[in-house]
């Protein structure tokens, strides 16, 4: 039974690889398929010989997956984050946080299954004491019932629900962790309206007086921005973050009419020109750090990935608090020199006084103003630009 189970796992891995490469022929994929077929043809081999062949086959799969990971195109990464086997927010809640309780909507904020809200806890030690630090977790859920959750496309009232609980977190003075898993907001203009609600979220998030840390896996257009304006932006290494989907960009580029289809080659070209990968976004300054994933993207059984993600979100939250709170130079040096794998080695209290909250809002304003300056070409005369900078 153990051998059969491992063979099924290899078959699933091969199918996953074929899915993310979009049916493209590849010598490495062909070799994996061939060797798996050869193993299946030796079903009557002695158990000892089969076990040895299976170990060799698993080693081959691991080696070739690493090679294939280096060959991924931007569109391949898009297919990775859209794959139903991709990690989802519920997987993260189960494996990154020590405890959580999902929260529904209320009053005029009707429940939108694609927007998941949870009160979660990070358990840390301070000497002999065990301290549970609360966090408000907000994000799009596209797995665990994809049709029911509309593929992560949030309706306006779902984004309104997210904003409501951001304000709750601000009232309770607890940090917010947002997880972006959306191809884009659902295009419905019923009240309060998709664009209007996204704008409302952005306006309110800019003034939140608690730290916000976001993790981006699939960041599609305005749907990502509805919960993505944060003090620290982390991005998964196989994710994408773009102003428009590659298919949408290709449709505009080709000027297609209703009923027509865009060629796959044009979609691939648009995905490359959009600069949507984690490396592209880090280079352009739209994110702060890339969180490494296993080869060919993180899936629910990659428990080491969840451990690394926990370290990164805890470290990012600590850095936001330490960056605005009053603390001694020695403590700052200790915090900056902590080992990369030991983010929880030094306890940081997640509380801010009013002066620190003011500094937090100001730093967030400066962060996004700088980002806007690099993305917008100012055509005003140099004198007007200098005067504007002096006033700010």
Question: Which residue ranges define each predicted feature?
Answer:
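Intrinsically disordered, low-complexity segments enriched in small/flexible residues
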Residues: 1-134, 142-144, 307-392
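Conserved catalytic cores of soluble enzyme domains
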Residues: 2-15, 19, 180-328
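Short, motif-level signal for alpha-helix interfacial/capping segments enriched in acidic residues
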Residues: 50-53, 158-160, 262-263
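A generic hydrophobic-helix recognition signal that picks specific residues
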Residues: 66-67, 174, 238
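Cleft-lining beta-strand/loop regions that shape enzyme active-site pockets
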Residues: 118-207, 211-223
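A short, hydrophobic secondary-structure junction motif
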Residues: 166, 273-280, 368-377
């Amino acid at each position: 039974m153990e051998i059969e189970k491992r063979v099924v796992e290899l078959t699933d891995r091969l199918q996953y690889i074929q899915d993310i490469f979009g049916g493209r022929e590849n010598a490495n994929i062909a070799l994996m398929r061939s060797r798996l077929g050869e193993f299946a043809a030796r079903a009557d081999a002695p158990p000892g010989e089969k076990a040895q062949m299976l170990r060799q086959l698993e080693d081959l799969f691991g080696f070739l997956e690493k090679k294939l990971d280096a060959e991924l195109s931007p569109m391949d990464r898009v297919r990775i984050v859209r794959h139903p086997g991709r990690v989802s927010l519920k997987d993260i809640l189960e494996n990154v946080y020590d405890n959580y309780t999902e929260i529904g909507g209320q009053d005029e904020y009707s429940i939108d299954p694609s927007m998941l809200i949870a009160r979660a806890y990070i358990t840390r030690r301070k000497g002999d004491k065990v301290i549970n630090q609360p966090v408000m977790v907000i994000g799009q859920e596209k797995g665990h019932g994809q049709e029911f959750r509309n593929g992560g496309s949030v309706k306006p009232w779902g984004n309104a629900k997210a904003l409501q609980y951001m304000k709750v977190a601000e009232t309770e003075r607890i940090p917010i962790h947002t997880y972006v898993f959306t191809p884009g907001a659902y295009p419905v203009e019923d009240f309060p309206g998709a664009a209007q609600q996204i704008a409302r979220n952005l306006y309110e998030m800019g003034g939140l007086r608690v730290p916000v840390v976001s993790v981006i896996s699939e960041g599609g257009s305005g749907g990502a921005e509805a919960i993505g304006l944060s003090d620290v932006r982390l991005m998964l290494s196989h994710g994408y973050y773009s102003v428009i989907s590659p298919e949408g960009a290709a449709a505009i580029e080709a000027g297609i009419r209703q009923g027509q289809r865009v060629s796959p080659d044009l979609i691939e070209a648009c995905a490359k020109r959009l600069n949507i990968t984690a490396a592209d976004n880090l280079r352009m300054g739209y994110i702060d750090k890339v969180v490494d994933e296993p080869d060919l993207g993180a899936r629910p059984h990659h428990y080491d990935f969840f451990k690394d993600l926990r370290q990164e979100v805890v470290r990012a939250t600590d850095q936001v608090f330490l960056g605005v709170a009053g603390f001694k130079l020695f403590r700052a040096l200790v915090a900056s020199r902590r080992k990369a794998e030991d983010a929880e080695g030094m306890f940081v209290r997640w509380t801010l006084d009013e002066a620190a909250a003011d500094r937090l809002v100001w730093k967030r304003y400066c962060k996004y103003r700088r980002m806007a300056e690099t993305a917008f070409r100012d055509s005003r005369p140099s004198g007007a630009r200098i005067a504007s900078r002096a006033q700010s």
